[in-house]
Amino acid sequence: DDKVSLIITCDNGITGFDQVKELKAAGLNVIVTDHHEIETSNNGEWAKQILPEANAVINPKRIDQDYPFTDLCGAAVCFKLMAALFKKLDGDYDYLYGLLEYVAMGTVCDIVSLTDENRIFVIEGLKRLNYTEKLGIKAILEESSWQKEIDVYTLGFILGPTMNATGRLSSAKIAIELLMEENIDRIYELAKELV
């Protein structure tokens, strides 16, 4: 009986007040990682940000924090949490750095500035993507007949839209299944469905 005890959001949750409250009432811990604007209330001279009642809310746009770069995408915010956990728990950095491919895709597709940390995420992610071992990504590119170098265009106009196509299909879970699947036949079946 593996019970879920923690929910970590990625790129959402900053306005999910009711949903976070329900999860907390059900006994779950909730960490919100998001980059979207935070709701504010203005009581006189001071503006106050209104946050969901999660165990932690990680958002570079929080005014009570002094994180130097506020234009991270949702995937990058979640990646930063993972990096902190990997450091604390002595995690496998090769695995963590392998996720830069997804952070690069998220950075381009979330249409944030390609400056500061975002620029580094995209450069490093593209280096890895051009030699990727991720079968789901390879299958999408193959099914899209993409045979050139993977660049920002590939992220923004081939990979990103293909992954987002799941919203138009019966279930958005198809993209996640594609990225996690290990059976090569199933991977290509899912890629064909998306492309």
What are the residue ranges of the model-derived segments?
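N-terminal small/polar loop signature for handling phosphorylated ligands or for N-terminal nucleophile
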Residues: 1-50, 58
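Hydrophobic helix-and-loop "lid/oligomerization" segment in the mid-to-C-terminal part
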Residues: 1-6, 25-27, 45, 53, ...
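Alpha-helix capping and helix-loop boundary segments enriched in small/acidic/polar residues
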Residues: 7-14, 39, 65-73, 96, ...
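Short, well-ordered alpha-helical packing segments
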Residues: 20-24, 79-82, 126
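Acidic, glycine-enriched active-site microenvironments
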Residues: 26-27, 32, 40, 70-76, ...
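A short, charged helix-loop
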Residues: 38, 52-66, 77-86
